[in-house]
């Protein structure tokens, strides 16, 4: 998996996994030594290019002694130029910072923040409880709050009092998981919202913040028990696996819209965004 984003000045940021110990890194970068195994992603890398893509501004490894990889679309840049990445690691020595959300080395999902110059790890944490979690979606708002979405097999996530749903819906099959949504404060990196949401489904999910205070969350649940709203396109699933699209108010984290849609077999939604205040475009 990999991710790419562009900041307001046109600089290009790329994150991914590498098995190459000679992957190009720059002097003074956070980590210039390859740490991982040469399989399943090796180490994560974060690289910043100039706007024309002709020069490396900085490039660094991030990882432990086993292996890790970045989540799809798992890189964003906040208003201060800090670089946020999410992914999965199997390394017990993956670099963490003080005041982390979770330091349990059984956890495989991670969330990390690099300084604008790529030289300092400002924040890094595992995310989860007692079983494997996967972070599949990452977005930030205009106040630099971080939103993540993903999937879990565990009932032990630290849900908040204002959660939409506080209990997991146990998957009926070993390859299915329950979706979760979390909001993390920009300054103290504490969880301000965490909820189970979309019933059991595959782990892929997409999340996108847009003005004014709208949070789109999409994925592919099984239809049973999905919390559709009265204005949904479809309130019942039609196939083995359906798409869902939902909209939250990002300030209150209240659900404003949720719908299922799809055909008679398996369907997956991979991206979505508003093109005006009332219209969402989706792709999958």
Model-derived features: positions:
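A sequence-level/structural motif corresponding to short, flexible coil/turn segments enriched
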Residues: 1-284
